Curated annotation (Swiss-Prot):
The lineage of its organism: Bacteria, Bacillati, Bacillota, Bacilli, Bacillales. The keyword Transferase applies. It comes from the Bacteria. This is Uncharacterized N-acetyltransferase YkwB. Residues 18-219 form the N-acetyltransferase domain. The keyword Nucleotide-binding does not apply.
Length: 226
């Protein structure tokens, strides 16, 4: 177990000690409980992490397996793998990018840190936990000398407007401040930039199966010279 960050966050009344570290096999049961808390129906329950998937994350790329704790309780997690991303052929599904969530397709010599998921307990979502997890992944992107961090974001309020506007227009409306989306708005505040709306990205009724590919470019990245 490697501790990556220790700091204090404010809950509106008092400061709480936050720890961010890599998760291990002993955390698996608590991580599954966190997923159930964060993604209730109508989110497909078969997409929640299984013991085998979490064990694969730890075995395949432990540096990309993060959890956040307050008072010894896991209240957030984030998982990533390294892939080879080609901007000229950006379309893909979540299942393709993550090997159905197992991350067994992790490419140590790839160019992109790909976010598999991020989750924070609803009781702790105003403490900036998600942003600190994301910042830790940005640091990993720089440390690994990767070109970017990338991942597909849900748009869980799109279903309310799908009869009126396209998914692309919905994203534009959120960016222009005409609408607010809990996931897309959060990712934008974390410094991510949308690059493409992808259909059939993930089975997700609320998002009508759309995903928004959003990246964070590593300004320190230098392409190796021949």
């Amino acid at each position: 177990m490697i501790i990556l960050k220790q700091m204090y966050v404010h809950d509106g009344r008092k400061f709480e000690a936050l720890t961010i570290r890599n998760y291990t096999e002993t955390d698996i049961e608590r991580l599954i409980s966190l997923q159930e808390e964060c993604f209730p129906p109508p989110f497909p329950q078969e997409l929640l992490w299984s013991e085998d998937q979490l064990a694969s994350h730890i075995k395949t790329f432990p540096e990309g397996a993060l959890c956040a704790l307050i008072n010894g309780r896991i209240i957030g997690s984030m998982t990533a793998l390294i892939v080879q991303f080609e901007p000229d052929s950006p379309d893909h599904t979540w299942a393709q990018a993550t090997d159905n969530g197992s991350i067994k397709n992790h490419e140590p010599h790839g160019n992109t840190l790909y976010v598999v998921d991020i989750s924070v307990s609803p009781h702790y979502r105003k403490l900036g936990i998600g942003k600190w997890l994301m910042n830790t992944m940005y640091e990993l992107t720089v440390d690994k000398r990767l070109e970017r961090l990338l991942g597909g974001g849900r748009i869980p309020l799109y279903y309310k407007y799908a009869h009126e506007i396209s998914a692309v227009q919905y994203v534009e409306d959120v960016m222009e401040g005409r609408k607010n989306d809990p996931v897309l708005s959060f990712l934008l505040r974390c410094g991510r930039s949308p690059i493409r709306v992808v259909s059939n990205y993930l089975e997700d009724k609320e998002s009508l199966n759309y995903g928004v590919l959003m990246e964070w470019k590593n300004v320190f990245y230098k392409k190796a010279s021949c």
